[in-house]
């Protein structure tokens, strides 16, 4: 963990030493396991209840939310000026993974609130910051993101919600928004909605969209929630999964004055909202990782305890005893597939968080540009690839359980249902693939993707110096070269006018880029692990390593990194 978490050395993070980081992550795990995890199944079964325009979340959510608030977890990585704790993004990501894995629908209320608050922090006036930020970062008030309309889903430029000036600097907002996560709930005293709308007379398409802050309740002079602002919840969706999160339809200004204030500049709403969208995409990638990790751990535990069938080597010996299913080759294959994906994706997401930390602390403009570009390249991979693989991991978990995995009594059934939405919301994975191919390959005249490939090659060169990793390094290096050639080929197709042809390969390109990225991260993990393994065992000869790993937990962990990298690179890397 400490090889990636909290590594940025800067005065801003001077309080976050190893001991402090361990304490933070340990406390996050305790809250997740003891308080949030028990709400997962109850929240799924009870769901949200819509009645007379109000939504009641599952009863168990209230205690968990209060404890989450008391621990000041919502604003872990934010400025202390508005109630944040100022942690490195890597530390916050590690802590958040536990809680999201415990109950993704519960933590979605937090994720949306945080993203909305960050919009206010980035683009709000001093008055707006004073009015909203502390209440939102504390979790006393909630937040959402109002983009989607019945006829404007991925095509946001087709929205019809209007903003009419009222003559006092505020606007009358009118329109309908759908699929709003946490759009109405009884966890918080007020809900602050960032709303995309078009000011009367503004240009059509995305060029004429502005961003507004629209609270559920207007804010009194003393900062308390006041008069209802006519943000009417007209219903919530019945969904396949994430039942504990209210997916609302909201009618703004249909039955009375719905008043909003401009956030940022007129007609710049899409540019501003992209900040929240990119944060949300990273959060959804973390949801994918966390749920995949939970599925893997459940499947591993089940396979270690479920006794069924004789060992393959027992042949036709009718006297042979049945063994735990983890002894069966195909179960082991599935578990190794899950393990390699989860660990590779985890390191990729933590690497992305580290780039955010570096970009936010470096004084070198060129380094800042490079790290920000790496985050841009990583965003569609983290959102698109990770959530695709998350569903795959969940499917493997169900398969390991066999028939029991298909029954709601067991947790993997719910996790698979919950994970399906991750591939859809905050920009479908088809959009993520198009973004990677259409925007990120050409960003900074191709330099952004070149920096990404260079980071991979740096790891390959470092790992190549270890004899035990020479072969794996060669294979990853070859994959990086082939990925570079593929990217150049697709760019040339676009330049030659073959746009439709090139973009038909967008999703396979995302998948290949993700697989190479996971191989890169697993190679890095093995590179870090081998010296530690040698220190624990005194040898890197595999038979001796495995014997000693059976007696030493840490040695087993480090040996596992080596074996996992070898499995993925040899068996799964394209």
What are these regions (language model features)?
Residues 170, 174-228:
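A short core secondary-structure module
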Residues 114, 125-128, 132, 428, ...:
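A structural-propensity feature for long, helix-poor, extended segments
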Residues 77-88, 105-107, 285-292, 388-407, ...:
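Conserved phosphate/anionic-ligand binding catalytic regions in large, soluble enzymes, centered on
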Residues 242, 351, 373-451, 567-574:
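Alpha-helix capping/hinge segments and adjacent helical runs
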Residues 179, 218-234, 239, 246-280, ...:
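A glycine-rich, basic-preceded beta-loop-alpha segment at the flavin cofactor/substrate interface
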Residues 1-107, 127, 131, 357, ...:
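Amphipathic, small/basic residue-rich leader segments at the start of a protein or domain
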């Amino acid at each position: 963990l400490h090889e990636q978490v909290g590594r940025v050395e800067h005065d801003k993070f001077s309080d976050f030493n190893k001991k402090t980081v361990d304490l933070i992550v340990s406390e996050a795990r305790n809250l997740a396991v003891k308080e949030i995890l028990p709400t997962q199944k109850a929240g799924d079964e009870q769901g949200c209840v819509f009645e007379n325009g109000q939504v009641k979340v599952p009863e168990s959510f209230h205690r968990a939310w209060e404890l989450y608030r008391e621990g000041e977890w919502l604003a872990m990585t934010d400025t202390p000026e508005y109630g944040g704790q100022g942690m490195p993004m890597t530390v916050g990501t590690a802590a958040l993974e536990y809680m999201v894995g415990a109950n993704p629908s519960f933590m979605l209320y937090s994720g949306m609130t945080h993203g909305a608050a960050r919009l206010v922090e980035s683009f709000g006036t001093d008055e707006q910051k004073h009015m909203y930020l502390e209440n939102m970062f504390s979790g006393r008030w909630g937040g959402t993101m109002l983009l989607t309309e019945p006829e404007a889903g991925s095509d946001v430029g087709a929205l019809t919600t209007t903003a009419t000036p009222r003559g006092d600097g505020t606007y009358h907002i009118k329109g309908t928004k759908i699929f709003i996560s946490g759009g109405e709930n009884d966890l918080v005293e007020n809900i602050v909605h960032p709303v995309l709308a078009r000011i009367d007379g503004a240009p059509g398409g995305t060029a004429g969209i502005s961003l507004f802050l629209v609270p559920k309740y207007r804010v009194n002079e003393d900062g308390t929630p006041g008069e209802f602002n006519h943000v009417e919840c007209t219903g919530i969706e019945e969904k396949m999964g994430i039942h504990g999160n209210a997916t609302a339809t909201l009618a703004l200004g249909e039955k009375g004055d719905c008043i909003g204030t401009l956030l940022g500049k007129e007609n710049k709403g899409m540019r501003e909202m992209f900040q929240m969208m990119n944060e949300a995409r990273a959060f959804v990638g973390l949801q994918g990782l966390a749920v995949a990790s939970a599925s893997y751990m459940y499947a591993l535990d089940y396979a270690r305890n479920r006794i069924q069938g004789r060992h393959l080597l027992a042949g036709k010996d009718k006297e042979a005893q049945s063994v735990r299913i983890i002894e069966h080759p195909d179960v082991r294959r599935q578990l190794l597939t899950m393990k390699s994906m989860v660990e590779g994706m985890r390191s990729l997401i933590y690497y992305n968080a580290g780039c955010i930390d570096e970009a936010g602390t470096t004084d070198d403009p060129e380094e800042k540009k490079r790290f920000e570009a790496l985050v841009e390249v990583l965003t569609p991979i983290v959102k698109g690839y990770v959530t695709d693989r998350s569903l795959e991991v969940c499917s493997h978990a169900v398969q390991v359980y066999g028939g029991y995995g298909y029954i709601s009594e067991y947790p993997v059934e719910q996790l698979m249902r919950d994970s399906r939405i991750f591939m859809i919301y905050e920009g479908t994975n088809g959009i993520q693939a198009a973004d990677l191919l259409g925007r990120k390959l050409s960003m900074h005249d191709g330099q952004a993707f070149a920096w990404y490939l260079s980071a991979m090659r740096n790891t390959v060169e470092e790992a190549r110096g270890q004899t035990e990793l020479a072969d794996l390094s060669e294979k990853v290096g070859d994959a990086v070269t082939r990925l570079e050639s593929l990217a150049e080929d697709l760019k040339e197709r676009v330049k030659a006018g073959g746009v439709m042809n090139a973009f038909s390969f967008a999703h396979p390109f995302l998948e290949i880029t993700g697989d190479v990225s996971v191989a890169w991260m697993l190679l890095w993990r093995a590179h870090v692990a081998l010296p530690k393994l040698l220190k624990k065992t005194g040898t890197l000869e595999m038979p001796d390593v495995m014997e000693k790993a059976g007696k030493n937990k840490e040695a087993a962990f480090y040996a596992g990194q080596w074996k996992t990298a070898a499995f993925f690179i040899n068996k799964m890397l394209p």
